[in-house]
């Protein structure tokens, strides 16, 4: 979909002297990322084949290993050069019905027997632990740092349906307002220095970059 250079956030940050890195622990040709990322202004792109020694959860590189990669990039950057890293994780990608030798779901919902729901919630907890690791690291960093954490979409209906059923609903009986909620995702903007605290603000992912720069 992107075939020419665009004035995206990495382009702007590069003009300010930032090193700009895109990292995605999956195949480089997915959605033509290896071609698109440079057009968006990233000076370096890192894909699955460069996640040497990474840990896996199910069949995907773990979020914990993604955090390790971000920290590695930060620690090896040239001193005094600011760094922008855009990391698209894979750990929690669907589907959620298969079984794996390296992952045992350990979260359940009372009154619900659902492998997809249990698997998804257990994966989210691992993501939460990885985020804690990332935040804890940059809390101690001397350089001012902002972390933006968000998802691109909610899990599929195999995960949502059991919760809806528990509340007497199905995916087909949702009102228009309820259906809209299926297309909302939470986000967090955190910094290791004082910024204006705000909660409950609805926005579009299109505007997250502007919010961070504000």
What name fits each language-model region?
Residues 1-214:
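Solvent-exposed soluble domains appended to multi-pass membrane proteins
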């Amino acid at each position: 979909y992107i075939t020419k250079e665009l004035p995206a956030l990495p382009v702007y940050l590069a003009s300010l002297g930032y090193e700009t890195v895109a990292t995605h622990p999956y195949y480089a040709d997915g959605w033509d990322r290896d071609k698109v990322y440079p057009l968006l202004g990233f000076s370096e792109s890192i894909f699955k084949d460069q996640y040497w020694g990474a840990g896996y959860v199910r069949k995907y590189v773990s979020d914990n290993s993604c955090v390790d990669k971000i920290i590695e990039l930060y620690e090896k950057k040239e001193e005094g050069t600011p760094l922008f890293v855009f990391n698209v994780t894979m750990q929690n990608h669907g589907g959620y019905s298969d079984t794996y030798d390296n992952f045992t779901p350990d979260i359940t919902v009372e009154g619900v027997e659902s492998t997809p729901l249990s698997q998804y919630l257990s994966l989210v907890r691992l993501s939460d632990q990885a985020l804690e690791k990332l935040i804890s690291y940059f809390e101690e960093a001397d350089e001012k740092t902002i972390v933006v954490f968000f998802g691109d979409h909610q899990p599929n209906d195999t995960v949502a349906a059991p919760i809806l059923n528990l509340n007497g609903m199905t995916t087909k009986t949702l009102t228009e307002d309820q259906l809209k909620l299926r297309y909302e995702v939470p986000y967090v903007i955190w910094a290791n220095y004082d910024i204006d605290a705000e909660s409950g603000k609805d926005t579009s992912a299109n505007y997250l970059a502007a919010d961070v720069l504000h």
